[in-house]
Amino acid sequence: METTMKKKGRVKATITSQKEEEGTVRKGPWTMEEDFILFNYILNHGEGLWNSVAKASGLKRTGKSCRLRWLNYLRPDVRRGNITEEEQLLIIQLHAKLGNRWSKIAKHLPGRTDNEIKNFWRTKIQRHMKVSSENMMNHQHHCSGNSQSSGMTTQGSSGKAIDTAESFSQAKTTTFNVVEQQSNENYWNVEDLWPVHLLNGDHHVI
């Protein structure tokens, strides 16, 4: 009976300890200080196991959070700035072949992350394609109604079809011209980290 009580006590203590540990995990946006700590730690020790990185570096973040922060923002080879028109066309071509296999698509765009490409596709390209498709359907319906009400000739109808094709071509061109300004003001770029790192003259984590 006493042994059972001790076991229950140990289990309860373990659960309590886990809950307390989970309660100390930071969530939300990363600070510049956290970026600097993670950057310097990986610079000196390498990536390794991310759960170990989170604990050894002293960051109160999960291993997954550290991994995503490094891969998507702090890696020296991460490409900065907006996605170019050339990259946009390549994404469209690759998506037609590979579908939503973002990691495979990212391999063809050096410096771009799979998460960045996925977000660009869903928020920019996919949205504009949907709007363009709806506009095209409305345009065709409008042209069809005008054709029936005015008793257009075959030759006139052919002319309208050509106009419709031209309009669709213009809409298609407009659809993919969706590269917009993307703000990186909330993040500390690696370009900001390096000067600080060099001025300190110290490779150790602060």
UniProtKB/Swiss-Prot annotation:
InterPro entries: EOBI/EOBII-like_plant (IPR044676), Homeodomain-like_sf (IPR009057), Myb_dom (IPR017930), SANT/Myb (IPR001005). GO terms for biological process: gibberellic acid mediated signaling pathway; jasmonic acid mediated signaling pathway; stamen development; stamen filament development. It comes from the Eukaryota. GO terms for cellular component: nucleus. Residues 144-159 have a biased composition (Low complexity). Residues 1-20, 138-162 are annotated as: Disordered. One of its GO terms (molecular function) is DNA-binding transcription factor activity. Expressed specifically in flowers. Residues 22-74, 75-129 form the HTH myb-type domain. Residues 50-74, 102-125 bind DNA. Keywords: Activator, DNA-binding, Nucleus, Repeat, Transcription, Transcription regulation. The keyword Lipid metabolism does not apply. It is found in: Nucleus. PROSITE patterns: HTH_MYB. Disruption phenotype: No visible phenotype. Myb21 and myb57 double mutant has an intermediate sterility phenotype and petals that grew to a final height parallel to the pistil. Myb24 and myb57 double mutant has petals that grew to a final height parallel to the pistil. Myb21, myb24 and myb57 triple mutant has a strongly reduced fertility and an arrested growth of the petals that never grew out of the sepals. Residues 1-11 have a biased composition (Basic residues). Transcription factor acting redundantly with MYB21 and MYB24 to control stamen filament elongation in the late developed flowers. Repressed at the transcript levels by DELLA proteins. This is Transcription factor MYB57. It comes from Arabidopsis thaliana (Mouse-ear cress). The lineage of its organism: Eukaryota, Viridiplantae, Streptophyta, Embryophyta, Tracheophyta.
